[in-house]
């Protein structure tokens, strides 16, 4: 016999966010007829290994529950079983679910309660949005960035960068499964996460608890999906094209369904039931873009329909090739995620997670829109490897150990070989015209197309000779201890260590000499002002402690965080001389590289005789006295000096107190630190 009731369960979301990946379920179970607490009532989350029983006060606590929707079962001998259908667990929140059991003489009777989440989260102490996987499925978006744009306090700049509360793009911290995922060079997401793989997306655009570091304006915490004991899968795809009735966009009149498409699929399920599960997904995504250029000229200054056989006429195959449109902001990408969860040992869960994505494409360059094959192509690749071990010490405490490595590689170039002979400057056509090296029939036939000045018009010859390469790697270790020490206090203590590696090489191909009409590509020397090149390996360390106090209707969060940053690098002793191979002071030109590295800025550089015949000695440092910003330079030795460690102690506090069933007072204070 089943009795179906629709009730509103008392679900309360507690605490300022802990950057974790699990939530907590608490409540009290009573005898409906007598009002007495039920001791030893079983509380079971169906289709999982999680459960507990009520104590002598009828109260229960379940920690470390992954976010999602669950059926929670209350059962006890002599009472009708109660199934709470659709209980939503949210990361870093406490869900209160109380129950009343009715006596029964018929074994197997049960009551089904449909849980409904309250619209007002009375105790949230910051601006926060929680988006579940079900909500993501219903959104007309395909990228995480598109989801973020829909949240309050978030704005997007012209380059697609995410800003929270008016801050910079680099002031947002991105996390995946509780570990940092930010690219420490740009501040953006280091490895792309697909919407299909997200179980829960948490966006905080306010104050943060002590567990959060490396953030000033916002935190984005993504919890990825796990496999279960049932095989599940899905396929998502779309195809289309860009169209516009505005004539400022070229070649958008025709519709081609293959111009923009995406295909993604995922599969999850058990490898060994109740012991080992998996989740696997993949996606391919391609777009030809919406900004097209009419490919009219070759990189050498000829039209693509030029007189190839030098007979002064356009004939044969020459007339069959015409200018054509080509997408100039296209991209081609793929991604994959694979996650295995082990629940083999008692009270211990071990997870292995890998995320890989690759993308290549071009950014629109207005000045090169008429040139065939002259734009650089961008190549980027992201890889994430994560290991997560969770061990329950008791029903009210557990520890987590997380180890991760995040790699992001980005390259941008036209030709793979930097000394490729096809490199040619945009001025080459202009120089050829000035030197009368363009055939007269080309000038007569195409007129103004070859009569141009490169500084004021679209390029009709040459290539983009920029080259950019960087590699970023972050290795992270996190250890956390969480304990519900009593009814009112949940403490969390942890440490966080990251080791970074940043390599960058940025330059443009140069001409070996400007005295001839032949362009011979060369690579600028490292250390010169025309080339930025470095490799740094800084480290970050943090420890924190926080307490969440839940007393009646009041929620208090208090925490303390210490964090330090060690650049492990060298910087110039003289702020006006950043380039050791290109000194600004002419007096330094005669010194060797070894002498520059060990220079004594107080040494005599040169001697002059004034109008009175007096000899005046000038030191190297005197050259910079006019700036009046380095009074101690003459006492310094060496071109470089070591950086220092930066550290900070950050207090965090927050209070939430409901004043009615429709209102709550929030207060929060924090001191935040980010390099």
Which sequence ranges carry the predicted segments?
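Periplasmic N-terminal accessory/gating domains of Gram-negative outer-membrane beta-barrel systems
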Residues: 80, 85-96, 110-210, 214-219, ...
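Signature of Gram-negative outer-membrane beta-barrel scaffolds
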Residues: 323-327, 464, 473, 484, ...
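Hydrophobic, lipid-facing positions within transmembrane beta-strands of outer-membrane proteins
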Residues: 160, 218, 231, 261-265, ...
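Outer-membrane beta-barrel channels and translocator barrels
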Residues: 141, 272-274, 345-347, 394-396, ...
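Periplasm-facing N-terminal accessory domains of Gram-negative outer-membrane beta-barrel systems
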Residues: 18-114, 119
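Transmembrane beta-barrel strands of outer-membrane/channel proteins
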Residues: 115, 235-241, 280-286, 352-356, ...
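Transmembrane beta-barrel wall of Gram-negative outer-membrane proteins
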Residues: 256-360, 380-398, 651
């Amino acid at each position: 016999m089943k009795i179906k009731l629709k009730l509103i369960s008392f679900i309360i979301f507690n605490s300022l966010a802990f950057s974790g990946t699990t939530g907590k379920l608490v409540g009290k179970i009573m005898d409906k007829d007598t009002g007495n607490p039920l001791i030893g009532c079983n509380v079971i989350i169906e289709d999982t290994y999680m459960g507990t029983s009520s104590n002598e006060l009828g109260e229960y606590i379940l920690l470390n529950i992954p976010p999602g929707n669950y059926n929670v079962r209350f059962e006890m001998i002599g009472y009708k079983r109660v199934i709470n259908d659709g209980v939503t667990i949210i990361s870093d929140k406490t869900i209160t679910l109380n129950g009343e059991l009715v006596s029964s003489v018929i074994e197997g009777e049960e009551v089904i309660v449909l849980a409904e989440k309250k619209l007002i989260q009375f105790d949230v102490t910051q601006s926060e949005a929680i988006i579940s996987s079900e909500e993501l499925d219903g959104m007309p978006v395909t990228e995480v960035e598109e989801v973020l744009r829909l949240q309050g306090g978030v704005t997007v700049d012209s380059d697609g960068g995410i800003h929270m509360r008016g801050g910079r793009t680099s002031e947002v911290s991105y996390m995946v499964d509780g570990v940092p995922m930010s690219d420490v060079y740009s501040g953006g997401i280091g490895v792309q996460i697909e919407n299909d793989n997200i179980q829960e997306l948490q966006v905080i655009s306010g104050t943060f608890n002590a567990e959060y570091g490396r953030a000033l304006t916002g935190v984005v915490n993504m919890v990825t999906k796990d496999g279960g004991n049932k095989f599940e899968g899905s396929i998502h795809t779309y195809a289309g094209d860009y169209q516009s009735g505005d004539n400022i966009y070229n070649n958008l009149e025709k519709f081609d369904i293959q111009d923009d498409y995406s295909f993604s699929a995922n599969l999850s399920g058990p490898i060994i039931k109740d012991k080992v599960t998996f989740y696997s997904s993949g996606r391919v995504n391609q777009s030809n873009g919406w900004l097209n250029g009419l490919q009219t000229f070759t990189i050498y200054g000829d039209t693509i329909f030029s007189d190839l056989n030098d007979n002064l006429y356009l004939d044969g195959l020459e007339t069959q090739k015409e200018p054509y449109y080509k997408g100039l902001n296209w991209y081609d990408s793929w991604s994959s995620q694979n996650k295995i969860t082990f629940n083999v040992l008692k009270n211990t869960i071990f997870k292995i997670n890998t995320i890989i994505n690759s993308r290549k494409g071009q950014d629109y360059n207005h000045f090169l829109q008429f040139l065939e094959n002259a734009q650089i192509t961008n190549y980027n690749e992201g890889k994430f490897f994560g290991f997560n071990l969770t061990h329950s010490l008791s029903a009210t405490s557990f520890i987590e150990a997380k180890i991760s490595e995040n790699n992001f590689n980005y390259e941008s170039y036209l030709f793979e070989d930097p000394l490729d002979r096809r490199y040619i400057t945009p001025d080459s056509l202009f120089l050829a015209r000035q030197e009368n090296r363009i055939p007269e029939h080309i000038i007569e036939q195409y007129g103004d197309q070859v009569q141009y000045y490169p500084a004021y018009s679209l390029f009709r010859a040459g290539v983009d000779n920029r080259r950019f390469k960087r590699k970023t790697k972050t290795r992270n270790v996190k250890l956390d201890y969480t304990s519900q020490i009593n009814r009112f206090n949940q403490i969390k203590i942890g440490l966080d260590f990251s080791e970074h590696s940043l390599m960058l090489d940025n330059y443009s191909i140069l001409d070996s000499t400007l005295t001839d009409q032949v362009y011979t590509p060369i690579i600028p020397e490292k250390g010169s002002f025309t080339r930025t090149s470095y490799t740094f390996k800084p480290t970050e360390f943090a420890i924190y402690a926080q307490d969440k106090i839940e007393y009646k209707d009041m929620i208090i969060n208090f925490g303390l965080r210490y964090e330090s940053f060690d650049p492990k690098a060298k910087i110039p002793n003289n702020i006006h001389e950043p380039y050791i191979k290109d000194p600004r002071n002419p007096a330094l030109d005669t010194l060797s590289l070894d002498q520059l590295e060990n220079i004594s800025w107080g040494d005599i550089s040169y001697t002059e005789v004034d109008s009175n015949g007096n000899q005046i000695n000038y030191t190297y440092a005197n050259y910079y006295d006019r700036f009046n910003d380095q009074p101690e330079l003459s006492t310094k030795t060496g071109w470089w000096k070591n950086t220092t460690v930066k550290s900070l102690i950050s207090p965090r506090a927050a209070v939430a107190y409901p004043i009615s069933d429709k209102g709550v007072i929030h207060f929060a204070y924090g001191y935040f630190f980010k390099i």
